[in-house]
Amino acid sequence: MIYLLDVNALVALGFANHEFHDRVAAWVLAHPSSTLATCAITELGFLRVLAQAPAYGLTVAQARALLLRMKEAAASRFIFLADHHDVSHLPTWVKAPKQITDGHLAGLARGNGGALATLDSRIPDTYLIPES
């Protein structure tokens, strides 16, 4: 199975002090045959969050290096999903502005035979990363 990690799941996986790091890391370890995925939106979101949020305090260069190390450490498990979806691919459940990116990512994952892996139970048609 391919799991496109949303920004929050990607940040939690990469930052050991994140409140959900153990949850995401345990899930990843429990599914060694699963393929993890990123895309331009999730990678850029990862950089933005880690460079902008005071809790992380990383520069853009440091955040980029962390993401590259994460992907290299699990090279056989990470793939990059190219994004060729336009707005016609948005799921019908997208009704509000806050749902647009989540809907797009869910559609991108589904279009590549996978699921959007998230910590947010409010996003329909996704895979909710379980608590350990």
Residue ranges and their predicted role:
Residues C39-E43:
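Short, conserved alpha-helical segments within structured domains
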Residues V49-L50:
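Short, well-ordered beta-strand segments in beta-rich or mixed alpha/beta enzyme
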Residues L10, R122-I123:
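Catalytic metal-binding/acid-base residues of hydrolase active sites
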Residues A73-S121:
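Active-site neighborhoods of divalent-metal-dependent phosphate/nucleic-acid chemistry enzymes
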Residues D125-S132:
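Active-site regions of enzymes building and remodeling cell-envelope glycoconjugates
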